[in-house]
Amino acid sequence: TGQICLCGSRILVQSSVLPEFQEKLLAATAAMRVGDPAEETTHIGSLVSEPHYLKVKQAIEAAPGTVLCGGGRPNNLPDRCRDGWFLEPTILTDLPESCALEEEEVFGPVASLRAFSDEPEALRLANATPYGLAASVWTKDLDRAHRLVQRVEAGVIWINAWMVRDLRTPFG
């Protein structure tokens, strides 16, 4: 549900692979099942409360970009979940760099998708937020990954992985 502080909410993709990546991302997002967390087939449960649901929904509605998918309540919720605070996973694009969704933590199933042309632009975009708890760098070029890890301003940075960690390690 994007309600942990290590969730990535800004997806930066090299422009040369953006069309293929976007197609695969949207297909994977469409396959996610939102619903009853007690059911094994559910990928995303509800948001924590009505005020939080309204905050996330308002952030989506106020975003000056394009909603590629999601943004609403799922239509196929089981009866026992109909009054819950469920939200479809949402991906937005065409956002200005200075909008709230690019600069603030939303803590919901919301992500922005943005292209970058080269490594310096990727680095600039990655560091263009006061929130830098975690980041993930995905690339076939390990030299590039190590260069970026040295310059991205984040406390935890994964290379070609996410949420792989030792829970005994100090954090925060």
Task: Outline where the language-model segments fall.
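ALDH superfamily catalytic-core signature
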Residues: 1-96, 125, 159
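Conserved C-terminal structural/oligomerization subdomain of aldehyde/semialdehyde dehydrogenase
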Residues: 33, 79-82, 86-172
